[in-house]
UniProtKB/Swiss-Prot annotation:
GO terms, molecular function: GTP binding; GTPase activity; metal ion binding
Keyword GTP-binding carried by entry: yes
UniProt family annotation: Belongs to the TRAFAC class TrmE-Era-EngA-EngB-Septin-like GTPase superfamily. TrmE GTPase family.
Protein residues bound to GTP: 240-245, 259-265, 284-287
TrmE-type G domain span: 230-402
CDD domains linked to this entry: trmE, TrmE_N
Predominant subcellular localization, coarse grouping: cytoplasm
Binding site for (6S)-5-formyl-5,6,7,8-tetrahydrofolate: R36, E94, K133, K478
The keyword Ligase is annotated on this UniProt entry: no
Protein name as annotated: tRNA modification GTPase MnmE
Subunit and interaction comment: Homodimer. Heterotetramer of two MnmE and two MnmG subunits.
Length: 478
């Protein structure tokens, strides 16, 4: 359930917002189940539920949880976090009972009877954001830590949650604010010699320093986005080229059926793996060819859809048979895909390279590789049978998408990259207005737009529909 334009405690006052509750642990059978409450009435609900008159903040209390008629629902621990010293900034109660959906649902129903409302997806985190306990980057990092598919992604998300990414953005915002102050002062007081920024070079130097730092943060964010999202890789080629065998090699297990019969793979098959720290969302596809088989034809249509949506294409071909006389891998790619994909999006995989056992075949392959290199493409020779070349393939793939995660990488999202790019564009405009046109008012406006774009990252400038979309993607109970 999406969180649509949540009401702000800053507008309504904390006491006007309903007390919310939700199961905070995963659904299903478990040793412990946690129900979280947040709001003005969380404390009184806990007292009524347990028959206790008081709870000490940050102290665990063993209690029984009662129905209205005195029947015991469950027993467990109550933790009380008094606002504003809590995750949400409000009074927060955690009820830790036994796991299992029957007991959890009975306990949650009783909490609702006592006046709490069902929390929307991400509503606890939204209240933390709304009460300045988290900025938007930190709030997103909670979801990213939960959804991390690799150890590197998880540790990067925790660094973002601790505020490292936000600190970089806030430092840049502070620089932009100082730049704007100097520029606008020069506009307002044009007769003052000490603010003649159009000719003294001071503002230009500060602007160029800010541009350089934006590019540094953007480079870090690109790595963070790759860590978070990974890349979607489609394996494509003719039937029996070795696509399914390559998927199995990369996955480290027999995920796809492999036979000598052409057309064995008739549908797309997805597998997610983490190699060299990069998450690869792999899709094996039906071999591309003309066919009268209805089922295979549907599989080929799905393959072409996957190809169109892929971040990276691995065109797998059998070096012993797939290249017709005088044809090259690039010509084969053009035949298979209808047009030659961009070099940054295509990696050519020469399978069964271990079977090149005569000089003429090796010479043809060498000539093909030279043509591939001259046109800016890359080919990796592999053997899916022996595993030779697979490590080279992974390293080449990581390099091709620009994945070189630094030790202290920070998780980032597509919207962060978009905001940073727009900020860089506005700064470039400001630089041009300053150095070419000497137009102070236009410099100030470009800097204002740059500040606004950068502020979107931490939530300083964010529309309600954006906030609803972000927090609506969270788990219930977060």
């Amino acid at each position: 359930m999406a969180l649509a334009a949540p009401e702000s405690s800053k507008n309504l006052g904390l006491s006007s917002l309903p007390t919310i509750a939700a199961i905070a642990t995963p659904l299903g059978r478990g040793g412990v189940g946690v129900i979280r409450l947040s709001g003005t009435h969380a404390y009184s609900i806990a007292c009524t539920l347990t028959g206790k008159s008081a709870f000490k903040p940050r102290m665990a209390s063993f209690c029984r949880f009662y129905q209205a008629d005195g029947t015991v629902i469950d027993e467990g621990l109550v933790l009380y976090f008094k606002g504003p010293h809590s995750f949400t900034g409000e009074d927060v109660i955690e009820l830790q009972g036994h796991g299992g959906m029957i007991l959890q649902n009975q306990l949650l129903a009783r909490v609702f009877e006592l006046g709490a409302k069902q929390a929307s997806a991400g509503e606890f985190s939204y209240r933390a954001f709304d009460n300045d306990k988290l900025d938007l980057v930190q709030a997103e990092a909670i979801a990213d830590a939960i959804d991390a598919t690799s150890a590197a992604a998880a540790s990067s998300a925790i660094r973002s949650l601790s505020g490292e990414f936000s600190q970089k953005i806030n430092q840049l915002l502070e620089q932009l604010i100082h730049l704007r102050l100097h520029v606008e002062a020069a506009i307002d007081f044009p007769d003052e010699e000490d603010v003649d920024f159009l000719s003294d070079g001071v503002i230009q130097g500060k602007l160029e320093q800010t541009q350089e730092k934006i590019q540094q943060v953007l480079a870090t964010a690109k790595q963070g986005q790759l860590l978070r999202d990974g890349i979607h890789v489609v394996l494509a080629g003719r039937p029996n080229a070795g696509k399914s065998s390559l998927l199995n090699r990369l996955a480290g297990q027999e995920r796809a059926i492999v036979t000598d019969v052409a057309g064995t793979t008739r549908d797309t098959l997805q597998e997610t793996v983490v190699l060299n720290g990069l998450t690869l969302h792999l899709t094996d596809t039906a071999g591309l060819r003309e066919t009268e088989d209805t089922v295979e034809r549907i599989g080929i249509e799905r393959a072409r859809t996957a190809i169109a949506q892929a971040d990276m294409l691995l065109m797998v071909y059998d070096v012993t048979r797939d290249l017709e006389e005088e044809s090259t891998p690039l010509q084969l790619a053009e035949q298979l895909f209808g047009e030659l994909p961009e070099a940054k999006r295509l990696l050519i995989i020469a399978n069964k390279s271990d079977l090149l056992n005569n000089n003429s075949s090796k010479e043809i392959t060498s000539i093909s590789q030279q043509e591939i290199h001259n046109r800016g493409y890359e080919q990796v020779n592999v053997s899916c049978e022996t595993g030779a070349g697979i490590d080279d393939l992974v390293e080449t793939l990581c390099a091709k998408v620009g994945f070189h995660p630094p030790e202290n990488s920070l998780i980032a999202r597509t919207r962060h990259l978009d905001a940073l790019r727009r900020t860089a564009e506005y700064l470039a405009e400001a630089h041009e207005q300053l150095t070419v046109f000497k137009a102070g008012e236009l410099v100030a406006e470009s800097l204002r737009q740059a500040q606004h774009s950068l502020g979107e990252i931490t939530g300083e400038f964010s529309a309600d529909d954006l906030l609803g979309k972000i927090f609506g993607s969270f788990c219930i109970g977060k």
